[in-house]
Swiss-Prot record:
It is an enzyme of class 6 (ligase). Pathway: Cell wall biogenesis; peptidoglycan biosynthesis. This is UDP-N-acetylmuramoylalanine--D-glutamate ligase. SUPFAM superfamilies: MurCD N-terminal domain (SSF51984), MurD-like peptide ligases, catalytic domain (SSF53623), MurD-like peptide ligases, peptide-binding domain (SSF53244). It is found in: Cytoplasm. The keyword ATP-binding applies. Belongs to the MurCDEF family. It comes from Sphingopyxis alaskensis (strain DSM 13593 / LMG 18877 / RB2256).
Length: 434
């Protein structure tokens, strides 16, 4: 695990004891820190106590003298009382990424790449890690993807830590200076956590303000908020765009099809070039990359159609590129499963691609508003739930068709998370048989 002498003798409070919280407790205790931990679940408190933590709710104790309150990214700092309680005690509220940043000076010489953005950051993170690993570079992928960073063994000299960073994780980092910082795109998301869209944009921009002058920013300037952030960067900057990718080249990368993946690829290519990879190594990595689950993932063929799981598309801006990837053809019709717990401005971002859709199958809380929004442009089925949508699509498809689950919504009205929704889709498709 990653530990640091800098934590020894200090006292930390840890609020939230899911996977990353318990990993934080373990790393801090192993570093010689004192830890007071809390979670509403008794079994989580027992696990923290077994690791050597004291048990106590940070809201009920005097925090003066603590080095930090470590919270999970899921704690809404704009509403949770811990923010004011820590501020009154002049104690920073941080996350495990900040602890990693503070431990960096004791790690073997390395680089850190941080990737953020509304959409595409998981794919870009995995793609950068894959290209580096394919070139023989020691790599560790973490942050908002994979295992908690503090649980991992430090990389050897010349290794690269590739971190997916949500806006919440950036909010909780104060000294993270990424050698390479990447922004994929920005569109409205998580507005319940910020003071409007401007607050969300400012959170993303902080990743670049934390960098030093000799570090590199890579920003895809295909949207206005990203252009604005790029205009304010005063250190080394590479502006990139999905338009920089030649469709002939992209055709050689089977897991990176569609305009959104052109943007993902151009961001990853720029980062790997900064890190010293040559064009041959980059091309090899692009050609051998495999899609992440729930992101334009081909889950199988059934009833003569190809079925794609894009459950990670939890807003309209992330669903739009998936629709764009399947233009109509005489032997290819697109059946779109959409709906769930709606965010933001409905399906406005998808409207330019409505002409690609033969029929939409609407589910969840968004079924009625989506039907009202798109019923004048697309034939619809009010499916209600995912199982019904799959059954109705299976009855309607013809050989060569595409069925795309790209919900443009969160999943929490009917599923635990987008992964559970994607797995339910996969199971329903597999049950259809070939």
């Amino acid at each position: 695990m990653i530990t640091s002498r800098a934590f020894a003798g200090r006292r930390y409070a840890v609020l939230g004891l899911a996977r990353s919280g318990l990993a934080t407790v373990e790393a801090l205790v192993a570093s010689g820190a004192g830890v007071t931990a809390w979670d509403d679940r008794e079994e989580a408190r027992d696990a923290a106590m077994a690791l050597g933590a004291d048990i106590g709710n940070p809201l009920d104790i005097d925090l003066i003298g603590f080095a930090g309150v470590v919270v999970s990214p899921g704690v809404p700092l704009n509403r949770h009382p811990i923010a004011a309680h820590a501020r009154d005690a002049h104690v920073p509220v941080i996350g495990d990424i900040e602890l990693f940043a503070e431990a960096r000076s004791e790690l073997p010489p390395h680089k850190v790449v941080g990737i953020t953005g509304t959409n595409g950051k998981s794919t870009v993170t995995a793609l950068i890690a894959h290209m580096l690993e394919s070139a023989g570079v020691p790599v560790l992928m973490g942050g908002n993807i994979g295992l908690p960073i503090l649980t991992r063994e430090p990389l050897p000299e010349a290794g690269v830590y590739v971190l997916e960073l949500s806006s919440f994780q950036i909010d909780l980092a104060h000294s993270l200076a990424c050698d390479v910082a990447v922004l994929t795109n920005i569109s409205p998301d998580h507005l319940d956590r910020y003071d409007g869209f401007e607050g969300y944009v400012a959170s993303k921009a902080r990743l670049f303000s934390l960098q030093h002058r000799d570090q590199v920013a890579i920003i895809a300037t295909d949207d206005d908020p990203s252009k604005m952030i790029a205009s304010r960067v005063n250190h080394r900057l590479h502006r990139v765009s999905a338009k920089d990718i030649d469709p002939v080249d992209q055709a050689r990368w089977p897991a990176l099809q569609g305009p959104h993946n052109a943007q993902n690829a151009v961001c990853a290519i720029a980062a790997c070039r900064v890190l010293g990879l040559d064009d041959e190594a980059i091309e090899r990595g692009l050609a051998t990359f495999r899609s992440l689950p729930h992101r334009m993932e081909l889950v199988g063929e059934a009833r003569g159609a190809r079925w794609y799981n894009d459950s990670k598309a939890t807003n309209a801006a992330s669903a739009a590129p998936a629709l764009a990837a399947f233009p109509p053809a005489p032997d290819q019709r697109l059946h779109w499963i959409a709906g769930g717990q709606a965010k933001g401005d409905g399906l406005a971002a998808c409207r330019p691609w409505f002409g690609h859709v033969k029929r939409a199958y609407l589910i969840g809380e968004a079924m009625a508003p989506f039907a009202a929004e798109i019923g004048d442009a697309i034939a619809i089925e009010r499916s209600g739930d995912l199982a019904s949508a799959v059954a109705q699509a299976a009855a309607a498809v013809q050989p060569g068709d595409i069925v795309l689950l790209s919900p443009a919504c969160a999943s929490f009205d009917q599923f635990k998370d987008y992964e559970a929704r994607g797995e339910a889709f996969r199971a329903a498709v597999e049950a259809l048989g070939a």
